[in-house]
A protein has these predicted regions:
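Surface-exposed loops/turns
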Residues: 111-112, 240-241, 286-287
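Recognizes extended acidic, P/S/T-rich segments that occur
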Residues: 257-287
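Pro/Thr/Ser/Gly-rich low-complexity, intrinsically disordered linker/stalk tracts
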Residues: 222-253
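Bacterial N-terminal signal peptides that target proteins for export
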Residues: 1-7
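Compositionally biased, intrinsically disordered or flexible polar/acidic segments
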Residues: 20-222
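Hydrophobic h-region of N-terminal signal peptides that target proteins for export
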Residues: 11-19
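Short proline/glycine-enriched turn/loop motifs at strand-loop junctions of beta-rich domains
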Residues: 112, 252-256
Length: 287
């Protein structure tokens, strides 16, 4: 009974793509098993102004492009102990006093085509007061044509294409679905690296740190998908007395219908119902 219910929630409602690459930034001083979220690749980042790691076929470089800013890992210990392994730790950019933090992420190895990148922004330090928002941009080549005499000369330069802004950072939120999130989409046309900038907006922020807890490539925007399912992902001990259990979840923004699939394997699901409610009673379950 447990297995069928679990497969429905994890594979259908959460819609985890087998192609998605997911990284959980961990505090470097703890064991990965203690602080890594389910289905995420652990990366413990040591203090410095640059850090490089591999993720599947990708090569990712983190660096702080502003002088005297450093990257380090940090955590909210109580949040980890209560089960939030994704957004209760992460990497933090600490700038000099009065500066706004910036983080540059260079990604090599993305295949040509359309891609997305989700980042979680939940501050693990116990900050109060004004919490700065985040702007996300991509480095993009710009070609300018200039006329010099009878000749036309093309000059290449790099510009920042803004992909998202006014992204709110949460503070010690212990549920990933409720934490600060940025979600961007972009196209890759060749084998050139993709360079993404995260930077704080405004210049008068007493709390001028920037936090990223994890990254997810090429997965649907969580705000538009079902979240917080019951039974929870990987819960193999749900009580399905009499072969029944009521499945519940948080509907995605704007969702009008929900398609329900049940099966014993993620690649062998069968559609059993369509409902307008974010709940469904599964019956005739067996082990």
């Amino acid at each position: 009974m447990n297995r069928r219910c679990f497969t429905l929630v994890a594979a259908s409602l959460m819609a985890l793509s087998s192609q998605a690459q997911q990284v959980d930034f961990n505090i470097a001083s703890r064991k990965a098993a203690e602080v890594t979220a389910l289905n995420f690749t652990p990366v413990g980042v040591k203090q410095g102004n640059t850090y490089q790691f591999a993720l599947g076929g990708l090569e990712i470089t983190l660096d702080a492009p502003v002088k005297d800013q450093i990257i380090k890992s940090n955590w909210f210990k109580q949040g980890i102990q209560l089960g939030d392994r994704l957004t209760s730790d992460g990497i933090v950019v600490y700038p000099s006093k009065g500066d706004n933090a910036q983080l540059r992420i260079t990604i090599r190895g993305l295949k040509p085509g359309h891609h997305s990148l989700l980042a979680y922004h939940n501050i693990v330090d116990g900050l109060t007061g004004n919490i700065p928002s985040i702007q996300v941009s991509r480095e993009k080549e710009q070609i300018t044509t200039m006329k010099k005499g009878k000749k036309r000369i093309q000059q290449k330069s790099m510009m920042q294409e803004i992909l998202a802004q006014d992204i709110k950072q949460t503070v010690r939120e212990m549920k990933a679905s409720q934490s600060g999130q940025s979600y961007i989409e972009f196209d890759v046309t060749d084998d050139q690296p993709v360079v993404i900038h995260y930077q704080l907006q405004g210049v008068d922020n007493a709390n001028n740190t920037l936090t990223i807890n994890g990254l997810v490539f090429d997965k649907a925007n969580p705000k538009a998908t079902a979240l917080n399912p019951y039974p929870a992902d990987d819960d193999l001990h749900v009580n399905a007395e009499g072969g029944k259990v009521v499945l519940r979840w948080q509907a995605g923004e704007g969702a009008k219908q929900h398609l329900i699939y049940i099966g014993q394997r993620a690649d062998q699901l069968k559609k059993v119902a369509t409902t307008e409610e974010a709940a469904f009673e599964a019956t005739s379950l067996s082990s």
